[in-house]
Amino acid sequence: VAEEPRTFGRLCLEFIGVLEKHRAVKTGLAMQRRIHTMLLRHTSKEIVNRKALTINPAKTCQPIGAMYAALGIHGCLPHSHGSQGCCAYHRSTLTRHYKEPVMAATSSFTEGASVFGGQANLVQAIDNIFTIYDPEVIAVHTTCLSETIGDDIPQIAGKAQADGKIPAGKYVIHANTPSYTGSHVTGFASMTRAMVDYFARSSGQRSDRINIIPGYVEPSDMEEIRRIAVEMGVRIILFPDTSNVLNRPQTGRYEMFPKGGVTVEELMSTGDSRTTLALGRLASGSAARALDTQCKVPCEILDLPIGLNATDAFVDALRKAAAVSVPDTITTERGRMLDIITDMHQYFYGKKVALTGDPDQLVSLSEFLVSIDMQPIHIVTGTPGKKFETRIREITGEVPHRVNIGAPGDMFLFHQWIKNDPVDLLMGNSYVKYIARDEDIPFVRFGFPITDRIGHSYFPTVGYRGGMRLLEKILDALLDRKDRDSPEESFELVM
């Protein structure tokens, strides 16, 4: 009888040993699987300075942004002045992101047009488009080929007008968007500026409307910006506006030109508005300044309203510009967002984050993360800009860690930084999933393009409601990882 406790103890120890061996085998197999499926195994830790080589760019080309902006005009057909392959790529990229068919025309360059210029192609295209599709506006954007040739789009459009190819009450606008410079964000900015250059007029009679240029954001974000203005009782002109264009409902009836988008009449009246709020310096600033110069409409350039502070600034600017008060509904939304931050702060605190995306989005997102005591330490954008780097340095000045900023940078450098200094969370577009898988890091999809999930065109990330959704996505990623890695004795039901 005296030996039974010792025998039982030995059995317990043997059983625990078996469990530990089993756990070690499982861990080893999991690591082995990860090693054998490394998708970016060529990425080295050693960082070599590169000036003339980009590996896995953190951006896409200007015409994609120009095409997206053009879709924000009601009854507009974007037109790619270049080869068929260029247009097919631009359309397919937007279609994969939005899961909606994106319509656009092309000048269909052949060898002859590539040598002698695309004037004949564009004049014929303008005639065909108005005859067959009857849009209100054709928005022409250039490509590498047509820019290299030196095609003069205003002159070609003028010839089409003189030849009677453009019907009365119809319009052809253009933006110069060569792919070998800038990015999709600068392409968006150029086409938005073209809307002002071609349409904005001043009658000398000021209206009570506020112009809002939303920046390169999702249709859901544009919808949310409009909703906030409506809640506050402010009359606005939002341009461009892709809501109800690239997130339109399924009605069972095909429409070449959906109901959404800013109308030509609204664009023409932007020159009489009280003021302009430009959200995002890079994507919206140029158009806002052009309105100020051409029509004397004063402008204020704000950060994208992502996160608590940036949304506060937007709501306050809207309140001051329209001389209205903030309604209780908006105050309630703000309080709910603040409540989430307060309740779950322990899970945000001190977490290191790596971000990649567009400059305007990264500025607001970095500020938001810092405000909830997270630490953005690797920040990469494919769009060059010294002002961006300066602003990020200001935002992350009190982060107790070295902060790496790539502007311009690429995904290869982004991955190298992460290898050398691991993080707790990744945020970026769908291409970041390869890094997330190889390095086994929680990942939140944010930005453009997102081709492997749905919801970004329907659920906003701007405003207080959008901020709550962003907090939820960040928390889900962090807490899912905590659940996955917690040993049995600390696997919690309530967090």
Where are these regions (language model features)?
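An N-terminal assembly and electron-transfer interface module characteristic of large anaerobic redox
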Residues: 1-495
